[in-house]
């Protein structure tokens, strides 16, 4: 049975590593990552609504104690 010639394996592996690294970097560069939303200046958006100038809250009535 003939012996397996492994004399070129080191050269092939050492050439493969930078190639895989380069391919991975190019793949990562082409990906679109999520961009966080930009902070908006609240002074830029002004709407003329009737509830904008006043502060209103709606309260529920207090619950009555249970009668037993």
Swiss-Prot record:
MF-aspect GO terms: proton transmembrane transporter activity
Question: Which branch of life, at top level?
Answer: Eukaryota
Topology in the membrane? Single-pass membrane protein
Transmembrane regions: 8-24
Per the record, the GO terms for biological process are: proton motive force-driven ATP synthesis
Which stretches are annotated as coiled coil?
none
InterPro entries in the record, alphabetically?
A: ATP8_mammal, ATP8_metazoa
Q: Which GO terms describe its cellular component?
A: mitochondrial membrane; proton-transporting ATP synthase complex
Asked if the Swiss-Prot or TrEMBL record annotates the protein with the keyword Metal-binding, the reply is no
- N6-succinyllysine: residues carrying this PTM: 54
* The family this protein is said to belong to: Belongs to the ATPase protein 8 family.
Q: Fill in the subunit field for this protein.
A: Component of the ATP synthase complex composed at least of ATP5F1A/subunit alpha, ATP5F1B/subunit beta, ATP5MC1/subunit c (homooctomer), MT-ATP6/subunit a, MT-ATP8/subunit 8, ATP5ME/subunit e, ATP5MF/subunit f, ATP5MG/subunit g, ATP5MK/subunit k, ATP5MJ/subunit j, ATP5F1C/subunit gamma, ATP5F1D/subunit delta, ATP5F1E/subunit epsilon, ATP5PF/subunit F6, ATP5PB/subunit b, ATP5PD/subunit d, ATP5PO/subunit OSCP.
Protein name (database record)? ATP synthase F(0) complex subunit 8
Question: What is the organism of origin for this protein?
Answer: Papio hamadryas (Hamadryas baboon)
Q: What is this protein's gene name?
A: MT-ATP8
């Amino acid at each position: 049975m003939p012996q397996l010639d492994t004399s070129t394996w080191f050269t092939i592996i050492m050439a493969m590593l930078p190639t895989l690294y380069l391919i991975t970097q190019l793949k990562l560069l082409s990906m679109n990552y999520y961009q966080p939303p930009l902070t908006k200046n609240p002074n830029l958006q002004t709407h003329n609504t009737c509830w904008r100038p006043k502060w209103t809250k709606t309260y529920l009535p207090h619950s009555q104690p249970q009668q037993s």
